[in-house]
Each structure stands twice: as structure tokens, then as C-alpha cells.
């Protein structure tokens, strides 16, 4: 299992948006695929890109782009990293344990759980009741939205108060104005939002966020070159204003046991466009909309076809594949516009 990690600089800015223009926490797998496809068109001839897509579309799966937290010890130069995955959309609660209002609010804020916590969730699935018999309050909560096991932060000389104060990003609103091309008059005043990376110094540790995604399958040199080019080209919107640069790229290998074992149920780590025969496997899910205009160096910016996808963290009663969908506008013939709705799944429950 190949993992690509990106280390943005302190104060790096990002604009990850949805179809309504609102900020998102992450880049979903379909958006990541589109960004890589656009970078491939910049690097290679469109016919070569079609060839690469045909060769790899059924062999390689991409997860969405997720966050990690890096703890760098400034005294000894050692670093420790924690990787986070989306919280499953199925209920997560301890059996026969009442929850008060304060604890409910704390648990509700958790959006991401660490790899170690996900391993615990895999064994906590209750087949008959269809929920996770697990207490999220047993985990260490970082910055309110992230949760990990005590073992994953063992050895760090930080207390619970320090963990709660961890902040990876801040959202900035910048005033903007639309200037008419005809008479240079200001027409509309608005605010543009963006996320800004924050490095924090706590005790001996420099705490910083990084981003990563997982690839399942064999990558050739062309795809690796495209991914590295995308880090320089940038991801998300407002790149002409300096947004989206991912910084240093690091590749590493992960063992397959967490992802390729058999399970009773599956949780998605990607956005998914299921086939008609796969809809019956839906258990817990949320829908997200994809629309907007195409981004291409060829031709005009036309509105692409609107689709709805299953959100990361959706739970399925069986393994599904998803599909790649052609969303090209009818009037755009320079090259195809694809949406990657392939399913990247992680099993839960014992077989």
C-alpha cells in the first residue's frame, strides 16, 4: 500500500470548496483524481493521458486527502506522526452506558479518528444492532476534532490541556471587490475564505499538520511524476493567489493488513458513485453534490454534469466497487471529463 505525504509550510493557505462555495476540511478522492488528471494533461499529450487512464483506472484506488499531526522534538530531533481517517457515519457508543449532555457534545465534535483508534473500531462492530460498541471518550482528543489512542501519544511530554489546545488550521476571511472590465468600477463587495496552516510550539515540541492519501495498486513512474507535479501545481481553488501548494512530498509503504482483510461490513475512505446493483448495500451514508465548471487548458470553461456522491465514512453491508463516470459537457470535445467514484474501503467486523 503506497502512501503519499505532503508537508505544507507554516502559514500555507488552502481553499478546498464544495459545489456551494463553502470551505471543506478535505479534498475528496474524486476531486483529488480530477486535480491529478488536470496535471496529467499539462504533463502529457491528451492521448497519452487517455492511455494512462485506461491502463490504471481498474488497477489503482485512491483515498481522499486526509490529515496527520507531526510532533517534532526540538531537543533531540526525533519526530512522531499520527495519521487520521474519517469517523464512520454509523453510531459509535458504549453499550448500556448513559451519556450526559456535556460528553455528548464532546463526542459529537470528533470528525477524525487515528489509525490506532480505527483498529479498535474494527473489532467493536455489533452485527445485530449495526453500531460500534465503543466509547470515544476513552481516546485522547486533540484540538476537539481529532481522536487517537493513548498509546499513539505515549512518550510525548504533553498533558491533556496541551492536546486540547492543538490547532492545525485557522479560517481567514479576506475582503474582496469585483472590478468591472468595462469601466474599472467596483461592483460587488464580498469576503473570500481560506484555511491557513498553523505550526504550534508546545514545550519541546513543534506541532504541525501534514496531509496524505493512500494508493492501492501498482503505480508506475508516470503516475508518481503526476502526483509530485500536483504538489507544485497546487490543489484546490485560488491557486493564482498563492493557495494550494502542498510542499515537500514523501512516499512510504504501509502494510496491507488494515485494508485488505475480509470483513462483514466496510467503511469508505473515498467518495463513491455506486452502481445500481450496489445501492442495496448502503447502511449509513450521506450524500454530497458535485457540480460547477470544468478546469482545462483546452477550450472554454463549461458547466459539467451534476452528480451526487456518497461521503467518506459511509458504511456498507458488503464490498462494492463504485465506478468512474463521464461528466463531460456535450459541447466540450477536446478531452473527456471524468469523475472518479471508485470505492476505497476498509473492513470492519469479524468474519
Predicted regions and their residues:
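Conserved active-site/ligand-binding neighborhood in enzyme cores
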Residues: 1-351
Amino acid at each position: 500500500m503506497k502512501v503519499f505525504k505532503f508537508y505544507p509550510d507554516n502559514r500555507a493557505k488552502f481553499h478546498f470548496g464544495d459545489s456551494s462555495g463553502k470551505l471543506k476540511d478535505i479534498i475528496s478522492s474524486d476531486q483529488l483524481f480530477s486535480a491529478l488528471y488536470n496535471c496529467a494533461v499539462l504533463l502529457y499529450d491528451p492521448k497519452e493521458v487517455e492511455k494512462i487512464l485506461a491502463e490504471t483506472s481498474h488497477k489503482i484506488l485512491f483515498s481522499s486527502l486526509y490529515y496527520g499531526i507531526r510532533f517534532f522534538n526540538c531537543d533531540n530531533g526525533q519526530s512522531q506522526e499520527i495519521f487520521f481517517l474519517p469517523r464512520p457515519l454509523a453510531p459509535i457508543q458504549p453499550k448500556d452506558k448513559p451519556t450526559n449532555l456535556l460528553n455528548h457534545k464532546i463526542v459529537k465534535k470528533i470528525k477524525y479518528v487515528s489509525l490506532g483508534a480505527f483498529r479498535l473500531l474494527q473489532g467493536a462492530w455489533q452485527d445485530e444492532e449495526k453500531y460500534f460498541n465503543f466509547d470515544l471518550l476513552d481516546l485522547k482528543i486533540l484540538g476537539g476534532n481529532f481522536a487517537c489512542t493513548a498509546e499513539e501519544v505515549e512518550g510525548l511530554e504533553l498533558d491533556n490541556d496541551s492536546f486540547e489546545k492543538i490547532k492545525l488550521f485557522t479560517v481567514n476571511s479576506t475582503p474582496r471587490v469585483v472590478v468591472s472590465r468595462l469601466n474599472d468600477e467596483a461592483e460587488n463587495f464580498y469576503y473570500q475564505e481560506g484555511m491557513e496552516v498553523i505550526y504550534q510550539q508546545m514545550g519541546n515540541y513543534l506541532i504541525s499538520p501534514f496531509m496524505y492519501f493512500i494508493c492501492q495498486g501498482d503505480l508506475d513512474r508516470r503516475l508518481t511524476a503526476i502526483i509530485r507535479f500536483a504538489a507544485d501545481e497546487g490543489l484546490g481553488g485560488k491557486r493564482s493567489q498563492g493557495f494550494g501548494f502542498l510542499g515537500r512530498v514523501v512516499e512510504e509503504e504501509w502494510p496491507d493488513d488494515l485494508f485488505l482483510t475480509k470483513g462483514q461490513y466496510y467503511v469508505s475512505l473515498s467518495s463513491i458513485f455506486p452502481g445500481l446493483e450496489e445501492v442495496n448495500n448502503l447502511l449509513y451514508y450521506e450524500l454530497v453534490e458535485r457540480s460547477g465548471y470544468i478546469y482545462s487548458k483546452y477550450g472554454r470553461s463549461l458547466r459539467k454534469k451534476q452528480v451526487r456522491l456518497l461521503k467518506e465514512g459511509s458504511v456498507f453491508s458488503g464490498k462494492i466497487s463504485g465506478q468512474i463516470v463521464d461528466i463531460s459537457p456535450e459541447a466540450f470535445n477536446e478531452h473527456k471529463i471524468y469523475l472518479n467514484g471508485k470505492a476505497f474501503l476498509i473492513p470492519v467486523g469479524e468474519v
